[in-house]
Amino acid sequence: MGGHYMKSVLFVGHGSRDPEGNDREFISTMKHDWDASILVETCFLEFERPNVSQGIDTCVAKGAQDVVVIPIMLLPAGHSKIHIPAAIDEAKEKYPHVNFVYGRPIGVHEEALEILKTRLQESGENLETPAEDTAVIVLGRGGSDPDANSDLYKITRLLWEKTNYKIVETSFMGVTAPLIDEGVERCLKLGAKKVVILPYFLFTGVLIKRLEEMVKQYKMQHENIEFKLAGYFGFHPKLQTILKERAEEGLEGEVKMNCDTCQYRLGIMEHIDHHHHHDHDHDHDHGHHHHDHHHDHHEDKVGELK
């Protein structure tokens, strides 16, 4: 095989149709400050090359025996739970001699909260003594995965704990409720005279541009209310700290998986078949059966990394 790389880390960015939303530049900075014996490669889920399979091919071609795949995604959702594991499953068949470890997305992390606090401060907010009638809306993309949606609520709650705002609400840009219009209405009903919207997005892309237009509309609709759009989460230096931590967990074989993650991949087929009723209780034999079936790249490979 040649090459002195035995271990590699493959970062998976989302990719974007919008060149301004491109995470390529940030991802290339992730290649610095590593142990020289570790190969660091990058790839993208969609819109850009290399894709995940090509990224894995590159790692193996350069001699990697262990490939740790890290999703650069804020919350665990469809892409991180289904699409990337599917590419890893294919790679395991193609390269039976290589160990694959799948790391965690950014998720609920102390440094992520620090980044959100920084974005609020940059917008001119005083987190220690905010005005009583100032509300903050933590705004996510929104999706069909309850795990990701509820994680955003947890992040909102932790932000409330770590600041002195009386009103901190959660809203989504699409797919699920409460949508941002509802979030704004709720803040106003609670007596807010100022509403700060804090986007929990990794990169600009089309959503931020749409959001800027929406904020203009809110200002026109509610002339006596101050609306402020804080900077989006973005590629902050602290994000590198989180991603490095996720990579190190993978390299050391200490990936802490969320069990819901496994159940979700099984449940997706039920959703498609319309068998996903509200009276289900996520019975555990589903989850564990699923562990054996799909997530063997956690179970049998993690322990082998030395």
Curated annotation (Swiss-Prot):
It catalyses: Co-sirohydrochlorin + 2 H(+) = sirohydrochlorin + Co(2+). Binds 1 [4Fe-4S] cluster per dimer. GO terms for molecular function: 4 iron, 4 sulfur cluster binding; metal ion binding; sirohydrochlorin cobaltochelatase activity. Its EC number is 4.99.1.3. The keyword Chloroplast does not apply. Residues 287-296 have a biased composition (Basic residues). [4Fe-4S] cluster binds at C259, C262. Pathway: Cofactor biosynthesis; adenosylcobalamin biosynthesis; cob(II)yrinate a,c-diamide from sirohydrochlorin (anaerobic route): step 1/10. Residues 297-306 have a biased composition (Basic and acidic residues). Residues 276-306 are annotated as: Disordered. InterPro entries: CbiX-like (IPR002762), Sirohydro_Cobaltochel/CbiX (IPR050963). SUPFAM superfamilies: Chelatase. It holds the Pfam family CbiX. One of its GO terms (biological process) is cobalamin biosynthetic process. Keywords: 4Fe-4S, Cobalamin biosynthesis, Cobalt, Iron, Iron-sulfur, Lyase, Metal-binding. Its cofactor is [4Fe-4S] cluster. Co(2+) binds at H14, H79. Belongs to the CbiX family. CbiXL subfamily. Chelates cobalt to the cobalamin precursor as part of the anaerobic pathway to cobalamin biosynthesis. This is Sirohydrochlorin cobaltochelatase. It comes from Priestia megaterium (Bacillus megaterium). The gene is cbiX.
